[in-house]
Amino acid sequence: MTISAQQQAVEEDLVERVLASFDSCENPRLKLVMKSLTVHLHDFIRDVRLTEEEWNYAIDFLTKVGHITDDKRQEFVLLSDTLGASMQTIAVNNEAYEDATEATVFGPFFVDDAPLVQNGDDIAFGAVGQPAWVEGTVKDTEGNPIPNARIEVWECDEDGLYDVQYADERSAGRAHLYSDENGEYHFWGLTPVPYPIPHDGPVGQMLQAVGRSPVRCAHLHFMVTAPEKRTLVTHIFVEGDPQLEIGDSVFGVKDSLIKKFVEQPAGTATPDGRDVGDQTWARTRFDIVLAPGNV
């Protein structure tokens, strides 16, 4: 499509007038962000020659995203995640540093007041699934163990649901614990399974319209904090999960985070002597390396 010089001048004049409206902003960072957003937004509108009908549809879509969002469901997080915006923001704010563990998306299902457990305890709290023994260390990039690092963990059950998705307000499949004096940690959880993100709302409709899967690869969430260290938000994924080939709906997978969950035959002795009955169980190891807080 050829755009006349006169039309281009009209469009460019509007951009300049909108940019000038931010000149009196006293916050330099806010001014930078708003001007950059304006340039890119107007470039997008002009690039695709957006119709008024399409723009009104987009406004209605965002309105629906807001309406379905509540204290248990954050549709805007899902939108950010499925467009890759969450992962891009993580990438620019978590620059690779030596061998520090890579970060990935936070997700919408974190809860602040997860129960405290001790090393060796079970975070499932009645959630159903294959038991999994998870162990590892927390160290700095020089190889020194980090004692007393706070480790938040959360995951779905075998039906692909988090506790907050149930109506009974249960607390299951989540907890926090601390690394011991040697920087070691271990706990029982569940072997992660793939699950669809909530797709009965506008974000799900978007994914369906463009032919994308709403399914997340099987994963276990971690958030690890320690004094003077960069906070780590990450997952571990399950080697051999078929969804890895299809793709993660929020682009969260990194090769370094794919771990073996080695299935143990029923009756195999557990590391801590726990009786898991006549079912199989799995074990995995995730050694965590935290970057310095000033990088």
From Swiss-Prot:
Its EC number is 1.13.11.37. Its cofactor is Fe(3+). Pfam families: Dioxygenase_C, Dioxygenase_N. Pathway: Aromatic compound metabolism. Fe cation binds at Y162, Y195, H219, H221. It is an enzyme of class 1 (oxidoreductase). Binds 1 Fe(3+) ion per subunit. InterPro entries: Catechol_dOase_N, Intradiol_dOase_C, Intradiol_dOase_core, Intradiol_RC_Dioxygenase. One of its GO terms (biological process) is catechol-containing compound metabolic process. Keywords: Dioxygenase, Iron, Metal-binding, Oxidoreductase. The keyword Iron applies. Belongs to the intradiol ring-cleavage dioxygenase family. PANTHER family: DIOXYGENASE, PUTATIVE (AFU_ORTHOLOGUE AFUA_2G02910)-RELATED (PTHR33711), INTRADIOL RING-CLEAVAGE DIOXYGENASES DOMAIN-CONTAINING PROTEIN-RELATED (PTHR33711:SF7). This is Hydroxyquinol 1,2-dioxygenase. It comes from Corynebacterium glutamicum (strain ATCC 13032 / DSM 20300 / JCM 1318 / BCRC 11384 / CCUG 27702 / LMG 3730 / NBRC 12168 / NCIMB 10025 / NRRL B-2784 / 534).
